[in-house]
Amino acid sequence: MEILAPSSYFSSSSWFLEESRSTTRWTAAENKAFENALAVFDENTPNRWERVAERVPGKTVGDVMRQYKELEDDVSSIEAGFVPVPGYSTSSPFTLEWGSGHGFDGFKQSYGTGGRKSSSGRPSEQERKKGVPWTEEEHKLFLMGLKKYGKGDWRNISRNFVITRTPTQVASHAQKYFIRQLSGGKDKRRASIHDITTVNLSDNQTPSPDNKKPPSSPDHSMAQQQTSSTSIHKLPFQWDQTSNETIMGFASSGHHGNMFQSNPFGMNSYGFKMQGQQMQRGGFCDTYLGSQNMAFQMQSGLHFPNA
């Protein structure tokens, strides 16, 4: 729910005109208290600015109204594309890197050249308009940003986590989320994304771009198999001769001295078996391809005496 008020409201407000000349600096703590108060008192709250000013010690009604106007201008500039938002790459719309750091320090986003965002990675205007419901993924990103930046820092949560939502939309979503949690189980006749309270990074990591690549072509797969098979020529091998067949086996480095030999018919547990028709003067070749071992079985139609 959008909570931005029209600009005309500020121009006609006596509070804003009377104290427009005062210039005060806002600390990080004051900004958090201010944005947290915005999440509590929406635009339909009577005497909204007086109540917001009460939540920010040392600030007057005119101060909080002017700060809100500046916030509104920032949001408008971001949506118009005048302010570059970090987190976009010129090659990939959105890239996540999960490091080994503690907490959310391992959560990084790629940056494009000069901090510019690509046109393909920019959220559509429809996604930022009023009335578009939040998705479960957006809510999880909101929880991650809430844990990193805390309550009130809606601007950083919007810029670095929920990039498809404006800071005011994040503040409004936070208001609904906290009201849902404070209800203590009441009025929960139907499920809501606001019931999701934690995000487990080990279970909910965003898939890396490598996992989203399309399946490789058969030629590419064959090239990979040929590359991997080149490492087998140095592995130890064994010869085993029986009355009617000769078997050459390759053992992996973890299983020296072992030869994997299977039934000539049916399915092998280490791979798929391809069997040809035995001819009178010919033979058939069984090939086994497994994750760790490779064996070739050749049986000839001719009989050789045992040594």
From Swiss-Prot:
Residues 109-133, 196-231 are annotated as: Disordered. Residues 154-178 bind DNA. Disruption phenotype: The petals are fused at the base, forming a tube that ends in the lobes. GO terms for cellular component: nucleus. The keyword Zinc does not apply. The keyword DNA damage does not apply. It is found in: Nucleus. Pfam families: Myb_DNA-binding. Residues 124-133 have a biased composition (Basic and acidic residues). GO terms for molecular function: DNA binding. PANTHER family: DUPLICATED HOMEODOMAIN-LIKE SUPERFAMILY PROTEIN-RELATED (PTHR44042:SF41). Involved in the dorsovental asymmetry of flowers. Promotes ventral identity. This is Transcription factor DIVARICATA. It comes from Antirrhinum majus (Garden snapdragon).
